[in-house]
C-alpha cells in the first residue's frame, strides 16, 4: 500500500504546485467547465474523506461545511474563500493524506460499506477506496491541466 500513498502524495504535490503557479486564475471558471481550479482541489480532499472515512464508519477530519461546499455535484458559490480557508485547504492536501496513511497502518479501517462509484466500480474495502481515490484525483489533476490550455 505504500506505493498508493506515495502516488497520492505526488499527485497532491503536483496540485499544490499547479495552484501556486495559477493563483491569478484559481477561482475562475473557464468556458466549458463547471468549476474552478481551487474547487477541484478542495473537492479531491472532500472525496477522499468521504470514500475512506465516511464509508468505513469513521469520523472525517474535515468539517461538514467543507463537505457541503465541495462534494460531488456542487459548484463554487459566489464569494471567493478567505485567505484562511485557502490555507486550510492547502494544509489539508497533506495533513489529510498523512492521517489516512497513519490510520490505515494502525488498522482503523475494519469495516467498509460497499459503494458504487459513478465511474462504474463498486468499492468494497479501504484498499479499493484508496486505489479508486488515486484514479479520481488523477482525473481532477487532468482537469486542472486542461483548464489553463
Placement of each model-derived feature along the sequence:
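Intrinsically disordered, low-complexity regions
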Residues: 1, 13-18, 23, 83, ...
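Short, contiguous alpha-helical
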Residues: 5-9, 16, 25-72, 115-149
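Hydrophobic alpha-helical core bundles mediating ligand binding, dimerization, or RNAP-core interactions
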Residues: 8, 12-15, 19, 93, ...
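Surface-exposed helix-capping loop/turn segments at secondary-structure junctions
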Residues: 21-27, 102-113, 149
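Short, helix-capping/interhelical loops that line the mouth of catalytic, cofactor-
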Residues: 1-3, 49-99, 103, 110-114, ...
Amino acid at each position: 500500500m505504500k506505493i498508493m500513498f506515495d502516488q497520492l502524495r505526488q499527485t497532491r504535490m503536483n496540485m499544490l504546485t499547479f495552484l501556486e503557479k495559477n493563483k491569478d486564475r484559481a477561482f475562475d471558471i473557464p468556458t466549458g467547465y463547471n468549476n474552478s481550479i481551487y474547487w477541484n482541489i478542495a473537492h479531491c480532499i472532500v472525496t477522499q474523506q468521504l470514500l475512506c472515512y465516511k464509508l468505513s464508519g469513521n469520523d472525517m477530519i474535515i468539517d461538514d461545511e467543507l463537505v457541503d461546499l465541495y462534494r460531488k455535484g456542487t459548484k463554487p458559490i459566489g464569494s471567493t474563500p478567505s485567505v484562511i480557508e485557502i490555507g486550510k485547504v492547502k494544509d489539508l492536501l497533506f495533513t489529510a493524506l498523512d492521517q489516512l496513511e497513519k490510520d490505515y497502518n494502525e488498522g482503523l479501517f475494519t469495516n467498509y460499506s460497499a459503494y458504487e462509484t459513478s465511474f462504474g466500480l463498486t468499492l468494497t474495502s479501504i484498499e479499493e477506496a484508496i486505489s479508486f481515490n488515486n484514479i479520481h484525483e488523477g482525473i481532477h489533476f487532468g482537469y486542472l491541466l486542461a483548464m489553463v490550455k
